Amino acid sequence: IFTIATIAVPVLTLNIMDAVMRFNLDKGVNHDEITKIGIVILLAAIIIGAVLIPISNGISSLSDLSLFIYFYCISSATSQIFLCDLRGKELLVQYSIGNILNTLLIAAFNIVFLLFFKWGIRGYLLAYSFANFIVSLYAFVVGKVYHSFFSKINKSKMNEMIKYSVVLIPNSFMWWIMNSSDHLMVTSMVGVAANGIYAISYKLPTLISTFTGIFNQAWSY
């Protein structure tokens, strides 16, 4: 489920988070204008995702989890866009704090939902969704995203940003193939249980990589 959701986010959002970061880095740019465009694309993704829920209900393996998957995808898209907004505005300390906060919240919510409430895959999805929404709120406040509500939509700039971000979607597919396609192969060959063990064993190196990646990305521009 997470493997599929990972690739759904850049497709639904047209990978606009990369454009938000890139165009905010330009000198003398109107940051509120760039952020507003990112929010507009996000709202469109939310609507399209809601329309797709009835379709996913027709897939037996997803029917019971469609709403949870939807909220996970939307929360992930929101947090990515707002965090990229912070990075584009060169609020690097706030960006790093947001990523660290996200990691800690995911761990905390997983402990509560999985160990105490025994909610299984629903708890796992909720843990990520809640963590992403909280981090989105944090980035919304420290990045002063609310200022963008009063700016007008620059259609030419929007087209420019979409042209930039859309061509990066294949790049997301390539990263997905490298990092996540193995989960589908493990599931198809030896079953879901084995894939669960494989996924858990991968968490520790991923966590370490996440912490180092946070600071590498924050200070790379």
Regions found by a protein language model. Give the residues of each.
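Helix-loop interface residues and adjacent transmembrane-helix termini in multi-pass membrane transporters
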Residues: 27, 88-89, 116-118, 180, ...
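Alpha-helical transmembrane segments of multi-pass membrane proteins
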Residues: 7-11, 43, 47, 51, ...
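Interfacial/gating helices of multi-pass transporter permease domains
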Residues: 1-9, 121, 157-164, 168, ...
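Interhelical loop/hinge segments that connect adjacent transmembrane helices in multipass membrane
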Residues: 67, 93, 97, 121-127, ...
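Helix-loop junctions and terminal segments of transmembrane helices
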Residues: 6-28, 206-221
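Membrane-interface helix-capping segments at transmembrane helix termini in multi-pass transporters
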Residues: 1, 26-42, 46-74, 116-125
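C-terminal transmembrane helix end/exit motif
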Residues: 20, 81-88, 92, 114-115, ...
